[in-house]
A protein has these predicted regions:
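Alpha-helical transmembrane segments within multi-pass membrane transporters and channels
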Residues: 99-145
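Hydrophobic core segments of alpha-helical transmembrane domains in multi-pass membrane transport
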Residues: 25-38, 66, 91, 117-120, ...
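Hydrophobic alpha-helical transmembrane segments
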Residues: 22-30, 52, 60, 81-85, ...
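Single transmembrane alpha-helix segments in multi-pass membrane proteins
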Residues: 34-98, 129-135
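Small-residue-rich segments of transmembrane alpha-helices in multi-pass membrane proteins
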Residues: 58-59, 87-91, 144-153, 217-220
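Transmembrane helix-bundle core of multi-pass membrane transporters
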Residues: 6, 134, 138-202
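Membrane-helix/interface signature in polytopic inner-membrane proteins
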Residues: 194-220
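Membrane-interfacial amphipathic/re-entrant helices at transmembrane-helix boundaries
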Residues: 2-63, 98-111
Length: 220
């Protein structure tokens, strides 16, 4: 019994260290929240928590997408420009379809969203194609597209905001509340569960982790 005790202690210590390494970010987040709570008690009030969730929702949704890229061992520097271009496309398509009398803003906004999603998909396909066709690092590919996409957004909008009387449902997505909870926060949470399901419960998620660990071994 006296011989096994050190082994058990060593195993327990190793298990604890592994847990700390695997959950370092979560633990640091908890420490940060507690520190802010002590310094400013109003930080943990329901109103402030909902406000933080609302303000961080868009960045959080973008971060989930970036996580998949980083897990696969790549990087995308053009995300901010893609967001800007997508927003401009939605507004431009909706406004011009309405001004041309083709469809009202409510329907035009839907078409604009679909066009923006398609453009984002094509940008991602182009990045992947350039990365594998020419063997260019994703850092270089996306660094170049960062400026190109931002320039396209500026050209489309002419450097000025695209103003229009957008439909209520469109505005509701950004400013509305359901049961007192901001809609962006609900979208953020919903995307989290989708992200978790993909990475933890699907073959695609395991493949992404495998590619990030060793792309050549994953290919074989």
């Amino acid at each position: 019994m006296s011989i096994k005790m050190p082994e058990m202690s060593l195993f327990s210590k190793k298990k604890t260290n592994n847990f700390l390494l695997d959950h370092m970010i979560e633990l640091l987040l908890v420490v940060l929240i507690i520190a802010l709570w002590i310094v400013e008690p109003v930080f943990m009030t329901p109103g402030n928590i909902l406000n933080v969730l609302r303000n961080s929702a868009m960045k959080g949704v973008i971060a989930y997408g970036m996580c998949l890229v980083i897990i696969s061992g790549e990087i995308d520097l053009s995300v901010g420009s893609q967001v800007a271009l997508s927003a401009v496309i939605v507004a431009w398509v909706a406004k011009h379809l309405n001004d041309a009398g083709i469809m009202p803003l409510a329907a035009g906004a839907v078409v604009g969203l679909l066009v923006a999603i398609l453009v984002g998909l094509l940008i991602g396909v182009f990045h992947a194609w350039a990365r594998h066709k020419f063997g260019m690092p994703s850092f270089i590919v996306t660094l170049a597209s960062l400026n190109i996409l931002y320039g396209l957004a500026a050209i489309i909008c002419g450097g000025f905001p695209i103003t229009a009387c957008y439909p209520d449902w469109y505005i509701f997505l950004g400013t509305g509340r359901i049961a007192g909870i901001p809609v962006p926060a609900l979208i953020f949470v919903a995307v989290f569960f989708v992200f978790w399901f993909i990475t933890e419960k699907t073959t695609l998620g395991r493949q992404i982790y495998a590619v990030g660990g060793n792309a050549e071994a994953a290919r074989l």
